[in-house]
Amino acid sequence: MALVRFATIITVLCHLAIQDGAAKSFPHGEKAPFPLTLIHINDLHARFDETNQKSSTCTNSKECIAGIARVYHTIKQLKSEYKTKNPLYLNAGDNFQGTLWYNLLRWNVTAYFIKELPPDAMTLGNHEFDHSPKGLAPYLAELEKMKIPTVVANLEKNGEPALKDSKIARSIVLKVGNRKVGVIGALYDKTHLVAQTGMVTLTNSIEAVRKEAQELKKKNVNIIVVLSHCGLDGDKQLAEEAGDLIDVIVGAHSHSLLLNKDAKVPYDTKYDTIEGDYPLVVKKSNNHTVLITQARSFGKYVGRLTVNFDCEGEVQSWEGYPIYMNNSVKQDEEVLRELEPWRAEVKRLGTQVIGTTEVFLDRESCRWCECTLGDLIADAYADQYTNSTVQPVAFVQAGNFRNPIEKGDITNGLAIEAAPYGSSVDMIKLSGADLWSAIDHSFTLDDEFRYNTAQVSGMAVVADLSKKPYERVQSIDIVGANGAKTALKKDQIYYVVVPSYLADGKDGFAMLKKGTNRVTGPLDSDVLIEYVRKRQTIAKTMFQEKRVVIENHTNGTCSWDLDSQRYKPK
């Protein structure tokens, strides 16, 4: 592919009178451009095994794509092919969460395969906190054994005990060829508001990157790469506001495919949408150029960008594209062998039958309506704490569910994939006023214009979506064991069971942090598995009573179907 050049197409020669700092990074008098090849992946999300085009389990071997064996074969090939152009392999985070491999084997399998081909640097994604800092710490410890550096400039531990011994740097300086290359990490600023980060918080990523870049400049580092898990929009903003100090942003989080539309290279035309050129180019007022890359997600692509720098660290030209991991891409034989015992363990654990369901446990409707999967999980939550003296209500937000469960056998794997996010099931004492407020909040639109409709047990809710936000709940009744209903009293204290994610006030449910006497319970998937085992059959009779009635729905209609998706969009 022809080199893309900006400004006038000439060879830029550095001044002989180079500043002392620049001279240390680039030998005095050197005229040739310095090539740096960035090989990058992001948002793997536990796709260790090959997948279909939709990044789900592949059942037809002739159509399988992606998988860590293809990804690693390609990275090794690129490192060899571009060995004279100073290759760096970067991982932009979110290696956790997304398949049964992670749900059953967690950090163990993730660390194992990351260590199989160590990146030169990596950052953390928000999903690395899905099982709290306690679930992250052993993963980092394993990577540190292989001296794999983890960089996040805007992460503050704040004394988080689980990460006390973890080495998370703000940046790292790598000696590449005869130059110094600084790699700064950045993570989505609001991660601590949407993930289980414990005491860890994330500061403003732009301010943190600027500050760290200034420190690197003082150390005579004039090529700076930002390894970002902030999303494409965040990366564009970063380039605008900190671009005078940085050169390339290797991105993640938004699962964006960047590719020049006129590039004659393969990509998934059926399921992937091109969101911009590879790379996106941001030109600063001082003629400084910043390049932004990203390589979709789920191991479907490996990005490769070769950038030529002059002796002052200015981008001169670039060339590259994301390589599609289609079925024709070879798989690394050694990695395939390493996958076999892990695959067998996932299959053994995942296929164990724990019960059956007579109804379709619908997940797609949960954002907009009462859904059968939500009913089941809320019932499991309430049952966890129900005894002769306590009969709690339960409330689960719609975003807590991932996969539906079809009629028939329910396996360990299906249950875990339905509720994979690793919240503990906690009980709090909460005022009726705060419970009302929390359920009302579930009928407000989030940043992606979705509701987070409350899925409840032991309650009957009526909401009118034609009303103003936070005035939409019209009534809440507490439903006793015998089915008797009594109106919720705002001045009364109730036992309420919620996921720890909500008890921590995430997703805007700050009112739930007012809960007292908090009891921390087992993982949500474990609670669901035990409840299904206890009942054995998830019968239609469990879903006869309407729990959440929504009036004047603005986006569609809600049915009470037990055999198919309940929500029908307009």
Swiss-Prot record:
Concerning what turns on (or off) its expression, the entry says: Up-regulated after blood-feeding.
What are the required cofactors?
Answer: a divalent metal cation
Q: Which Pfam families match?
A: 5_nucleotid_C, Metallophos
Question: What InterPro entries does UniProt report for this protein, alphabetically?
Answer: 5'-Nucleotdase_C, 5'-Nucleotdase_C_sf, 5'-Nucleotdase_CS, 5_nucleotidase/apyrase, Calcineurin-like_PHP_ApaH, Metallo-depent_PP-like
Among the record's GO biological process terms, what is one?
host-mediated perturbation of symbiont process
Q: Name one GO cellular component term.
A: plasma membrane
UniProt: AMP binding residues: 367, 402, 507
* Site residues (Transition state stabilizer), renumbered to this chain: 127, 130
What does UniProt give as the signal peptide span?
1-23
Q: Which residues are glycosylated?
A: 108, 287, 326, 387, 552, 555
Q: Does the record carry Transmembrane as a key word?
A: no
Quote the EC number: 3.6.1.5
Cell compartments where the protein resides = Secreted
Q: Which GO terms describe its molecular function?
A: 5'-nucleotidase activity; apyrase activity; enzyme activator activity; metal ion binding; nucleotide binding; toxin activity
Which keywords annotate this record? Blood coagulation cascade inhibiting toxin, Glycoprotein, Hemostasis impairing toxin, Hydrolase, Metal-binding, Nucleotide-binding, Platelet aggregation inhibiting toxin, Secreted, Signal, Toxin
Which proteins does it associate with, and in what oligomeric form? Interacts with human PLAT; the interaction results in PLAT activation probably via an allosteric activation mechanism.
What other facts are recorded?
Answer: Protein is mixed with the host blood and ingested by mosquito during blood feeding. A reduction in both Plasmodium berghei oocyst intensity and infection prevalence is observed in mosquitoes that feed on mice immunized with the protein prior to infection with P.berghei parasites. Immunization of mice with the protein reduces P.berghei sporozoite infectivity in the mouse skin after mosquito bite.
User: Its function?
Assistant: Cleaves adenosine triphosphate (ATP) and adenosine diphosphate (ADP) to adenosine monophosphate (AMP) and inorganic phosphate. Enhances fibrin degradation in the midgut blood bolus. Activates human tissue plasminogen activator (PLAT), probably via an allosteric activation mechanism. Inhibits ADP-mediated host platelet aggregation in vitro and in mosquito midgut. Inhibits host neutrophil activation in the mosquito midgut: reduces neutrophil extracellular traps formation in the presence of platelets and the formation of total cell- and mitochondrial-derived reactive oxygen species. (Microbial infection) Promotes Plasmodium berghei parasite transmission from the mammalian host to the mosquito probably by reducing the blood bolus viscosity. Facilitates sporozoite transmission from the mosquito to the mammalian host during blood feeding.
Provide the protein name.
Answer: Apyrase
Organism of provenance: Anopheles gambiae (African malaria mosquito)
At the highest ranks, the source species' classification is:
Eukaryota, Metazoa, Ecdysozoa, Arthropoda, Hexapoda
